[in-house]
Structure formats: structure tokens, C-alpha cells
Curated annotation (Swiss-Prot):
This is Phosphoenolpyruvate carboxykinase [GTP]. It is an enzyme of class 4 (lyase). Belongs to the phosphoenolpyruvate carboxykinase [GTP] family. The keyword Cytoplasm applies. Its cofactor is Mn(2+). GTP binds at residues 276-281, 392, 423, 518-521. It comes from the Bacteria. Binds 1 Mn(2+) ion per subunit. It is found in: Cytoplasm. It catalyses: oxaloacetate + GTP = phosphoenolpyruvate + GDP + CO2. It comes from Rhodococcus erythropolis (strain PR4 / NBRC 100887).
């Protein structure tokens, strides 16, 4: 099939909706390779949403939910083999292997292009190829970060409408020669003439590949989330982190929170936590201390750059939330529930109730019968998860009742504090303030979480996840640490955000949590704000500054003084045991570990001696 015979390649009326020569040439090249039945330029309209969601319902991919419960919302259940990001099949194909570094899978880019080119050949037969123009961050930014995803998945098109600024207005912004990231995606499930489709097409062979120097993403075989919605982790973190390194900014796996004091002063906080450490819950926190309020600007990704005034400003490049459903409820995260309840949401791999609503583990209610995420009848006696542990909601940010008005401001917001955190039962106190920027980078470089189940590795083993970026770095981790240090050195030290390390998950000897977490974490945020204002007391310890017992506002909190003391304790023996674990991690990072990080490590060892 030649390009001339592919319907839609030149628009519906023979005139392409863009005059961007490079884009049109790329669309034609990919269409000739993948051989779709037709090409459609996505416009992001309500009519398109209605048409594609109806098509997905008719295909059995989507179930339309009860409009009275979840208006304009849908449930999709994936193939059981396609339920999460696949780190083992995710590649950073830099020109030189050293530039991918020890934390990434690497293949020679020419070899990968040949391998994937063979997979792409004819892979869209029987399907429509959609051209999805999108923008990460506000479209009216000074330098908007544009992309175009080519995909044969309607699920991707409707999800990208929620997660990004997408459609005709982005094509207009591209003009005739604007730069864009090329993002190619296929389910890898061609259809022969007359072949019946399956509800969730995918391929056992999967690749999620990034070419950082070329700013390109190639994804094959998966229809799921971060593997297929290429604006999210692939562009906004892996490719953007490489762009940020080259251009002098930061692309980080961070929430952005606005905390407002009783005096009505706003503080903006960015925080990086690995998965299962409460990032979305903190992003949407309801403070429990009187007079304090919180608003959110994002729960997952922050792009940060220095403004003309020397302060570090952050924007959230996303347009929607792609949150983990299990554990989300009216107690743990009421604002997420209020966002979802307004509808316009795509759910994936949650359970379906008898009245056409959704349910997952941890949600209020005690259903006696459900259709589970695999499409099977489910009762409490089934002994299986009704919803997949990584099931998701994809919902517009604009629906969140506590979105800060400035969330869509291309200038961003000035960051006062950066938080790093992991899930540690021992060793790491509730909150520690770094001595300075470089010490803060050392803290971020050593973030880790204990493995929680034998299936994930030995229980208690610390999995390092530097700045919560381990799965998302687009280049060498050592160069990444150096980039953080360099940005700090080139900035006005008095205007740099203060850096803190938090750990909501410390446990007592009997295994119970010492700190209640959730909304009570606002008490820790209050201490952080008071440290920024030079008002709160702290104790200098070998690992940094921790609050005095009296400096933390625990008024009205039902936690014993002994538990607070233990949560804040710096146990020298535990930290001495941590040293060889950090050494092992730094050995893995290898020759590119910055001297500044090594200096901080040696200083810590001396303070512990």
C-alpha cells in the first residue's frame, strides 16, 4: 500500500490539517511502514471523544459507567499480561552506552531501530493510525514543549485528551516548522481481512525505547498507561530529563503543593517519593492543624527552572491525574475522590459494581458481588483482588476542588522547599533538614525504600531510588547527580529551596507505625515552613537537622511523646549499618559519581565515627 492510497493521510477533504513539512513527511513514512487502513488527525474535540469512546464500548474494550454515578466515564480492562510499566523492556538508546549509565537498559540505537523497524512493518494493518498532537505544560508558555504521538489505539487517544493539552490548537502552535518530540506507538496487533479483534489488543513482545539525543520515543506491544501514553513518563521524565540536562533545568518525578499559613502566606513545595510512598495523598493533603490550608498543582511531575529573579520555579507539565486506585478513599484522599466523582474519567483494571459504578480494594463499601478486573464474577469469598493492585483512574486536573489557580500558569511557582522521601521502617527520621544544597543532593541520591514482600526481593532490602527517578532517568545517573550540584553552584545560594528528607513510615519495635501520616503530615510541613522562616528549633545531628520534640506542633494529636521521640530519633548504630549499603549503591553508580557526593559521604562517615 502506498501513501497515496491510505485514506486520511491528506486530511478528510484532501487537505492536511497542517502544513508542517517534517510532521507530514514523518506521518507518511510511518504510515508506509506500518500500513494502517486509514490515518486520522486527532482534534481533541468533544465530538471525537464521544465517537472514540462509543467505538471502544462497541469493541468491548470499554464499559460505559452509570451516568448518575460517574458521568461520561468508562472502565477498560486490559489483557492480564499488560498491566504495568515494563522496566525490563524499557531502553535508553543513547549513542554511547556510558551516557545511558548503569541504571538503564541500553542497546546501540542503530541496532534498536533495525529491530523495531522490523516489528513495526505492517503492524497497524486493519487499524486506524491516529496523529495526536500534544503539549506538555501550558500551551502559552514561552517555549512550549510539543510532541506528536502516532498510535493505533483509541484508548491512547482518549487518555491523551485527559492527560495532555491535545488536538488542533497544538497543531496550530506547531506552525510550519516548530520542534516536536516524535512519539511512535503501536499495539503490535495487526488484523487480517475479516479477523475479529480482541477487547485489549497487545503483543507479547514489548519495547519502550527512547533515543535521547534525537528526542524520539518508540513504543511497541503494550496498550497500557506509561508504556502507551507517551507524553507521561517517556516524554515528561525520560526525554525531558535529557533535554533539561542539555538546557540547564530539571525534569523531576515530583508533586507540587501549595501550603497556605494562617497569615495567608503561600509556600510552594516540591516532593519526590518512590511509588507506594504517598505522593498523590500529600499532593492533595487536607491539613489537620487549624488555620493551615493546602492546594495542589500536580501529583507526579515537576519541571523546574530558575527565573530572572534567581528563584527556582516549577510547572506541572500534565493536564490530568493518572492515579493508582487501590487505597484511594474518602479517608486517605477525599480530594481525589471528589475529582473522580465529577466524571469524565477513564478507569483501567478496577472492578465493576452491579449498578454500573466502580470499586477497588480500600474503597468504602462492602460489595457482595462485582465483576472483577479480569471480567469474572467476584464475591468476598473469591479470595482474589477485585481490582488489579496497579489499577488506575485517568481524570482531568481541572476537576480537582483544591487545584491552585496558578496550576496552569506558564511562569510556574517559586519553590521554597524540596522534599525527598522513601519508605523506611528504621534509621531515617520523620524529617531531616539538609545542611545546604549539596548535602540535599546527597540525601536525594541515597533515597531508598525497603522491599515489602518476598516477591519483590528479600524483605527489608533497601532498593535505592535516587530522587525517585530510578525508572525514569533519560541519561547517566552520575551525570544527573552532577547536574543537580552544578545548578546549585550556579544559583544564588540564598534563593535556593531548602532540602528535607521525610519518612512517614518509621515503625516501633512492635511493628506499628510511629506516625499517623496522611493529613497529620501537615504538622511536618508546618515545621518545614517555620524552618524556611527561621522560626522553628532544630537539633544538629550527624545526618542533618531534626526537630526538637517541642518544635513539632502535636497539639491535639493522639500520639505518645515516646513515639514522637522515636520517630525523630537519629540512631547512630543504625546509621553506621547504613554506610555499607550506601557504599554498595555508590559503587554501582560507578566512575561518574560526582566528587561532591563522595565528599558528603565521607563527611557523614566522619560525623558518625
Amino acid at each position: 500500500m502506498t501513501s497515496a492510497t491510505i485514506p486520511g493521510l491528506n486530511g478528510t477533504d484532501g487537505t492536511p490539517p497542517t502544513q508542517h513539512k517534517e510532521l507530514l513527511a514523518w506521518v507518511q513514512e510511518v504510515a508506509e511502514l506500518t500500513q494502517p487502513d486509514r490515518v486520522v488527525f486527532a482534534d481533541g474535540s468533544d465530538e471525537e471523544w464521544d465517537r472514540l469512546t462509543t467505538k471502544l464500548v462497541e469493541a468491548g474494550t470499554f464499559t460505559r459507567l452509570n451516568d448518575e454515578k460517574k458521568p461520561n466515564s468508562f472502565l477498560g480492562n486490559s489483557d492480564p499480561s499488560d498491566v504495568a510499566r515494563v522496566e525490563s523492556r524499557t531502553y535508553i538508546c543513547s549513542k554511547e552506552e556510558i551516557d545511558a549509565g548503569p541504571t538503564n537498559n541500553w542497546m546501540d540505537p542503530a541496532e534498536m531501530r533495525t529491530l523495531m523497524g522490523d516489528l513495526y512493518r505492517g503492524c497497524m494493518r486493519g487499524r486506524t493510525m491516529y496523529v495526536v498532537p500534544f503539549c506538555m505544560g501550558p500551551l502559552d508558555a514561552e517555549d512550549p514543549k510539543l510532541g506528536v504521538e502516532l498510535t493505533d489505539s483509541e484508548y491512547v487517544v482518549v487518555s491523551m485528551r485527559v492527560m495532555t493539552r491535545m488536538g488542533s490548537k497544538v497543531l496550530d502552535k506547531l506552525g510550519t516548522d516548530g520542534f516536536f518530540v516524535k512519539a511512535l506507538h503501536s499495539l503490535g496487533a495487526p488484523l487480517a481481512d475479516g479477523q475479529e479483534d480482541v477487547a485489549w489488543p497487545c503483543n507479547d513482545t514489548k519495547y519502550i525505547t527512547h533515543f535521547p539525543e534525537d528526542r524520539e520515543i518508540w513504543s511497541f506491544g503494550s496498550g497500557y498507561g506509561g508504556n502507551a501514553l507517551l507524553g507521561k513518563k517517556c516524554y515528561s521524565l525520560r526525554i525531558a530529563s535529557a533535554m533539561a540536562h542539555d538546557e540547564g533545568w530539571l525534569a523531576e518525578h515530583m508533586l507540587i503543593l501549595k501550603l497556605i499559613s494562617p497569615e495567608d502566606k503561600a509556600y510552594y513545595i516540591a516532593a519526590a517519593f518512590p511509588s507506594a510512598c504517598g505522593k498523590t495523598n500529600l499532593a492533595m493533603i487536607q491539613p489537620t492543624i487549624p488555620g493551615w490550608r493546602a492546594e495542589t498543582l500536580g501529583d507526579d511531575i515537576a519541571w523546574m527552572r530558575f527565573g530572572e529573579d534567581g528563584q527556582l520555579y516549577a510547572v506541572n507539565p500534565e493536564f490530568g491525574f493518572f492515579g493508582v486506585a487501590p487505597g484511594t478513599n474518602w479517608s486517605s484522599n477525599p480530594n481525589a475522590m471528589r475529582t473522580i466523582d465529577q466524571g469524565n474519567t477513564v478507569f483501567t483494571n478496577v472492578a465493576l459494581t452491579d449498578d454500573g459504578d466502580v470499586w477497588w480494594e480500600g474503597l468504602e463499601g462492602d460489595p457482595q458481588h462485582l465483576i472483577d478486573w479480569k471480567g469474572n464474577e467476584w464475591t468476598p469469598e473469591s479470595g482474589t483482588h477485585a481490582a488489579h493492585p496497579n489499577s488506575r483512574y485517568c481524570t482531568p486536573m481541572s476537576q480537582c476542588p483544591i487545584m491552585a489557580p496558578e496550576w496552569d500558569d506558564p511562569k510556574g511557582v517559586p519553590i521554597s522547599a524540596i522534599l525527598f522521601g522513601g519508605r523506611r521502617k528504621t534509621t531515617v527520621p520523620l524529617v531531616t533538614e539538609a545542611r545546604d544544597w549539596q548535602h540535599g543532593v546527597f540525601m536525594g541520591a541515597t533515597v531508598g525504600s525497603e522491599q515489602t514482600a518476598a516477591a519483590e526481593g528479600q524483605v527489608g532490602t533497601v532498593r535505592r531510588d535516587p530522587m525517585a527517578m530510578l525508572p525514569f532517568l533519560g541519561y547517566n545517573v552520575g551525570d544527573y547527580f552532577q547536574h543537580w550540584i552544578d545548578l546549585g553552584k550556579s544559583a544564588d545560594a540564598s534563593k535556593l529551596p531548602k532540602v528535607f528528607y521525610v519518612n512517614w513510615f518509621r515503625r516501633g519495635d512492635d511493628g506499628r507505625f510511629l506516625w499517623p501520616g496522611f493529613g497529620e503530615n501537615s504538622r511536618v510541613l508546618k515545621w518545614i515552613v517555620e524552618r524556611i522562616e527561621h522560626k522553628a528549633a532544630g537539633i544538629d545531628t550527624p545526618i542533618g537537622v531534626v526537630p526538637t520534640g517541642s518544635a513539632l506542633d502535636i497539639d491535639g494529636l493522639d500520639v505518645s511523646d515516646a513515639d514522637i521521640t522515636e520517630a525523630l530519633a537519629v540512631n547512630i548504630d543504625e546509621w553506621k549499618a547504613e554506610i555499607p549499603l550506601i557504599e554498595e549503591w555508590f559503587d554501582f553508580v560507578g566512575e561518574k559519581l560526582p566528587t561532591g557526593i563522595r565528599d558528603e559521604f565521607e563527611a557523614l562517615k566522619q560525623r558518625l565515627a
